[in-house]
Amino acid sequence: MLNTMFPTINRESSMLGFGCMRFPTTPDCKIDESEAIRMIRHAIDNGVRYIDTAYPYHGGESEVVVGKALKDGYREKVILTTKLPVWLVKTHEDMMKFLDEQLKKLDTPYVDFYILHAMNNERMDAMQKLDYKRFYAEAIAQGKVRYPGFSFHDDAKAFLRILHDWDQWGMCQVQMNILDDENQATLEGIREAGRRGVGVVVMEPLRGGLLANPPVDVKAVYDAYAVQRSPVEWGFRYLYAMPEVITILSGMSTWAQVTDNLRIFDMAKRPTLTDEELALYQKVKATYLARTKTRCTGCKYCQPCPMGVQIPRIFQGYDAAMLRADSSFKAGYAQIQADHADASQCIHCRKCERACPQHLPITRFLEEIHAASTAE
């Protein structure tokens, strides 16, 4: 296993981290507890030193199962991270209330990282008003939390705002993969975190599995390259070549995924990507993106629409279906129609187009996607 170090806090981790939001489930959709525990412990026995969970994962049951998995001496072997559900926090006191509830679920007196979950500009406003820094000082003084951090879903400007708001962040958790190097935190945001000594933990390294099972045209790009690796290996290699990345989370849901990831990371060394490899990644990205229509980043500057059209939901859902080369969006669009948020509500005011930082022809895209999604 490739071992790593969080720079400012001088804490050892592993390049592979176990994300606990996609555990195996039983036919009645409950966590297969015995299998999940077996998977976590096998990963730890083979060098994984970072475990990531959160308050809402698996309907609130992920933390309970993680707590059970970390019995019998396993807790002391890992960095344990869970997250404050900031969207549920209404008062300063709520922060400690949620932390105490989560510690009870995890059956541990402390967590290593307690991070603000899914932060964006709006949530940062709320956390500042509720004095999140004072909460962390209290939780750390009481021995319940070792280090603060945040996970993130917004644009690059918002990321830098949150990153620069405090010099005590121990880590940041961001979405990054071959397709998202210019989305959300962006590569430059990751580099700025590195310059500030804030360790980067990557989520969605394979875009929810999308990059693990590429369509035929993307697979052909990989197959034409001189060195043969699986798409999963290529996806992880892109990330662990980044010196700022300390841990890459994988939401493993099967024993096979655990063993395959352990195999990949057992062989991993931080490479310096060659010009040929960088060109390969650019070609893979371009081939994926050529399948999409809108390339909407989900920034939501177009929202709210005066007619209630959920533009990012439509655009990102459609593009995702095109990336997967399937027809699943039709069912999703039917639900958007049922919500009265589909493109037929558009009155062509073009308020959205004036607000779009990508200068997308939103009205035209809405018409074309509506036609494609409602055709017999």
Predicted segments, located by residue:
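Structured C-terminal cap/extension of enzyme domains
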Residues: 44, 49, 68, 188-376
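Glycine/proline-rich, positively charged
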Residues: 27, 87-206, 213-220, 226-227, ...
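N-terminal binding-site loop/beta-alpha segment at the start of enzyme catalytic domains
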Residues: 1-78, 135, 141
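Structural motif
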Residues: 42, 46, 105-106, 143, ...
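A general structural detector for well-ordered alpha-helical segments in enzyme core domains, enriched
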Residues: 2, 35-39, 62-69, 98-102, ...
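Conserved, mostly hydrophobic/aromatic
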Residues: 6, 18, 36, 43, ...
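Structural motif corresponding to the early beta-alpha repeats
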Residues: 57, 73-92, 117
